[in-house]
């Protein structure tokens, strides 16, 4: 006959686990199953096997209860951490005797780390793909760009300047492209000083013409395109405020396309002379960097002709410094622009709460025609 005490190490943890799960640890003498809703105890109910099996089950339960009581009186209650976890329970869960937060927090932290590493890997892959596309495009059109630059260089000086001015006018419209290419080409062909002067004059003329044309003919088209962009809508609202010129200058340093910025600012009520001055001031840092980059590309031909290792090193260092400085300027401009947008919107909300929107003084900031977009009202002229 099997000794009933041999099953005690298996019976005891399960019984104590049940007691710890319900939150109540009873005394050994009072250890008894719960009563049912009808008031009968669970061992009084007859199982399907009949009365004989019920009597055997009752005797086994009584023997186990006696052994359990004797064991508890001698050794005491075990610690909660020694109890086995139920099937499917996490470490640190309710059935293991520990805190439920520990296991769940570990799983969540692991998942967040995995997601963060996945996002980082995706960003790295995207940067590599974009870099590969840029180098491939440069390799494909390098010969054509070289022939084009040589053709422009062979032209008369005045004709070449007029050609650059026409190019800056074209890229100043919303659908134009190639603003940075023209800047680098001007520095490449005319040097740092003359190329810089050509850039300033050409961009000023192109900005003026694009502003007037978009304001007279393309206001509805520009407003329809802006309504789906929260960032451009916020820029317009801030430009309509008191710090509009600062926002215009900061926006010129952001990666927003040059022609698109001209179209966006054309539907505001910023005075044209002030707008041109703020645009020129905002574009000046990137123009300096692009002109210097074009001048560096001019020196690349001398480096290749000399086949000097130190020349290659200096050229690569100049390129890296120029690109890094450009990224830093753009990043700082984005931070300042976002701060200006937040500050102006908070000021606008405060003024609306105070009732300044009905100011009879005729302030141009509140007495404008308003277009209702999906993201809110955008003031335009």
Swiss-Prot record:
Keywords: Endoplasmic reticulum, Membrane, Transmembrane, Transmembrane helix. InterPro entries: TVP38/TMEM64, VTT_dom. It is a multi-pass membrane protein. Residues 37-47 have a biased composition (Basic and acidic residues). Residues 1-50 are annotated as: Disordered. It is found in: Membrane; Endoplasmic reticulum. Its main location: membrane. Interacts with ATP2A2. This is Transmembrane protein 64. GO terms for cellular component: endoplasmic reticulum; membrane. It comes from Mus musculus. Disruption phenotype: Mice exhibit increased bone mass due in part to impaired osteoclast formation. Bones show reduced osteoclast numbers. Increased osteogenesis and impaired adipogenesis observed in bone marrow-derived stromal cells.
């Amino acid at each position: 006959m099997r000794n009933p005490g041999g099953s005690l190490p298996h019976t005891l943890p399960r019984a104590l686990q049940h007691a710890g799960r319900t939150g109540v640890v009873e005394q050994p003498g009072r250890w008894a199953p719960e009563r049912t809703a009808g008031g009968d105890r669970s061992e009084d109910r007859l199982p399907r096997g009949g009365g004989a099996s019920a009597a055997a089950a009752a005797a086994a339960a009584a023997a186990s209860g006696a052994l359990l009581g004797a064991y508890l009186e001698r050794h005491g209650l075990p610690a909660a951490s020694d109890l086995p976890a139920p099937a499917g329970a996490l470490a640190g869960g309710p059935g293991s005797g520990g805190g439920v937060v520990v296991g769940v927090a570990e799983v969540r932290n692991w998942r967040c780390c995995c997601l963060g590493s996945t996002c980082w890997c995706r960003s790295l892959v995207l940067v590599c793909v974009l870099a590969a596309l840029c180098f491939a495009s440069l390799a494909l059109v390098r010969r054509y760009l070289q022939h084009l630059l040589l053709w422009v260089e062979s032209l008369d000086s005045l004709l070449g300047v007029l050609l650059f001015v026409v190019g800056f006018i074209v890229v100043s419209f919303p659908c134009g492209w190639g603003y940075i290419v023209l800047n680098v080409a001007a520095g490449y062909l005319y040097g740092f000083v003359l190329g810089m002067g050509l850039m300033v004059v050409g961009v000023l003329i192109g900005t003026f013409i694009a502003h007037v044309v978009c304001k007279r003919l393309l206001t509805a088209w520009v407003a329809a395109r802006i309504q789906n962009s929260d960032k451009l809508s916020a820029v317009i609202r801030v430009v309509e405020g008191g710090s509009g010129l600062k926002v215009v200058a900061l926006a010129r340093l952001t990666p927003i396309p040059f022609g698109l910025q001209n179209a966006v600012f054309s539907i505001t009520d910023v005075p044209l002379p002030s707008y041109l001055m703020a645009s020129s001031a905002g574009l000046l840092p990137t123009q300096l960097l692009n002109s210097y980059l074009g001048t560096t590309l001019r020196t690349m031909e001398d480096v290749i002709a000399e086949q000097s290792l130190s020349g290659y090193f200096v050229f690569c260092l100049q390129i890296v410094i120029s690109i890094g400085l450009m990224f830093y300027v753009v990043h700082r401009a984005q931070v300042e622009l976002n701060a200006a947008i937040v500050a102006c919107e908070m000021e606008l909300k405060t003024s609306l709460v105070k009732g300044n929107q009905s100011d009879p003084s005729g302030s141009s900031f509140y007495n404008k025609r308003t277009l209702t977009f999906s993201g809110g009202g955008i003031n335009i002229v």
